[in-house]
Amino acid sequence: MARYRCCRSRSRCRRRRRSCRRRRRCRRRRARRSCRRRYSLRCCRRY
């Protein structure tokens, strides 16, 4: 399964992987929504 991490933008995720590692994980859809609401971050797939 692909692991998800929360990042501010997808472009940053693809370019800088380190920025994603420190962010929280978001596997399920609930986690993805919580990232957007609480931290106002978007989830990116690869890190």
Curated annotation (Swiss-Prot):
Disulfide bonds: none annotated. It comes from Galeopterus variegatus. The gene is PRM1. It is found in: Nucleus; Chromosome. Keywords: Chromosome, Developmental protein, Differentiation, DNA condensation, DNA-binding, Nucleosome core, Nucleus, Spermatogenesis. One of its GO terms (molecular function) is DNA binding. GO terms for biological process: cell differentiation; chromosome condensation; spermatogenesis. This is Sperm protamine P1. Belongs to the protamine P1 family. Protamines substitute for histones in the chromatin of sperm during the haploid phase of spermatogenesis. They compact sperm DNA into a highly condensed, stable and inactive complex. Testis.
